[in-house]
Amino acid sequence: PSQVIRGTASAPTVNVRTIATDGEYADGPARVLLPLLGIYALGTVSLQGFNLVYLRVAQDIGAGDASGLITAIPGIVLGVACFLYGTLGDFIPLRRIVDVGIALIVAGSLLGFAFSSSLVGVIVARALQTLGYQAAASAYMILATAIRDPKKRGLYVGLMCAAFQGGTAIGMLSGGILADINWALLLLIPLAGLACLPIMGRRVPARAHAGRVDIVGLAIFSSLALLLTL
């Protein structure tokens, strides 16, 4: 017999133990969240490594007074991406966002390594990589903060902070080592995140809330954020 539940409906949350037809959290949150965390951590390693050796990079490619752009542009992209993905995650399936992010990481890594002698090539490549790994980070936080169990939610949010700190430390170490070998190898580090894909599979949720993306609003906000940081 059917049951009728009366009362105010609560806001929808992600049930991490629900086995959905699209594979959402089929084996628990760890099979989804930890691979996303790995992708983010490797992106942080590359980012922080470049922040350490950017003057050496500028010297090798003859960037001159434009050397600051090597770190400034990816930093601006990171700030805009944090807001952008957080908003798009309400309307676009997280799986699609993650798929696009992986594609951007691959494109940025290969492009940057191939054109590592060009200032524009390095900047564009690092911007693409930043957009890519931040997609994984945003998807991670959206899913982690939706976990109902407060202890597990706190654990996964804490792991994100640990991944950033660990990625920063390893990035500094990697930058110092690779600066004297070949700093362009820093651009290939995010590719190691591809090893996380078989673990994650297609378990990232493919569902999205109904609604319309305010393209104009996003464009205005992104432009203002860009102007404020320049």
Regions found by a protein language model. Name each.
Residues 1-202:
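Transmembrane-helix bundle of Major Facilitator Superfamily
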Residues 181-230:
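Hydrophobic transmembrane-helix bundles of small-molecule transporters
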